[in-house]
């Protein structure tokens, strides 16, 4: 993928979200050096720390030694810790998870997006990762194990198994009611599209959330959905998935099992960005829901 495609991807995201790029700054008055050759430490209170954005907390942690990082995170809930680890460097992730009791580490992994949890576990030795997987709830464990089967540089390696779907034969009203009451849909933090599946979980089409909420309630979804969406298979290289996201101005692309057409997950635009953009560029992009 050529360098100008990276820039197009960044521009596409900013245009789609209609957001201006902002730089998040941590005031230096909240950070102090203990001694000449000591690491940085925070003066900000624990209460204030937990109210900060996960990405900002992660930026702070990356500049602290692992011992201080672990101490700062003691008062975090499992969900807060998971959100922060998703934004942290692999080194911080490994240090924090290693410092937790295995049962709590598994609870934190359950709160993370499956693709993020899979990336974290892939960096651990087999014995440690297997121990944590065995402690996770069955459904979460299955999702993560599925992702770990795919090469790290493939679409399957960066996809998430959390996406909003409805039966293809639904009306608009039935689809909206399903999304309001379905627990899996409530867990989807990246609901820009709704995927229409048949009883065999094969993809029949896709409809944007905007089109869904503005369509007449009594009409069949078949009158509104795109029955020929852009898709990738789990072994499609990450860079190709990112190129498709940029080319077609997509917020996500479905990952399909090529032989059965069963829908496995989605590659979201933020994961596509993480794949191809240099770190310095990523930090200038707006934050996404679930990112």
Segments predicted by a language model, with ranges:
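Hydrophobic packing positions in regular secondary-structure scaffolds
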Residues: 1-291
